[in-house]
Amino acid sequence: MATSNNAKFSIGEVVKHRHFDFRGVIYDVDFEFNNSEEWYQSIPKEVRPRKDQPFYHLLAESNEVTYEAYVSEQNLLLDKSKEPVKHPLIEEIFSGKKGSSYFKISN
């Protein structure tokens, strides 16, 4: 798990996508793009994010569907709703929630 001063968001924060209708809780951070080139090229060129920025791993939800998402910092906004994220893996990674943030389970 990574933490750094150059990431705008932190592990445990609930965020929403700037352009698409989904939200999620951050469970890991890559400080620059760290996925496959095939995945990157599958994003339409006109909306493809820069690689030289943090990318976040999310336990995401959209309507009644849950999944894991990999999203660039430029496409995220803080979710201020304080509503819990309803993802089946939340309890495996986080031990609780206070306000709008989740807390990691200590190893």
Listing of model-derived features with the role each one plays in the protein:
Residues F33-S42:
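Short, solvent-exposed secondary-structure boundary/capping segments
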Residues E13, S42-V47:
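Intrinsically disordered, low-complexity boundary segments flanking structured domains
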Residues D28, S36, N75-L77:
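Charged, low-complexity, helix/coiled-coil-prone segments
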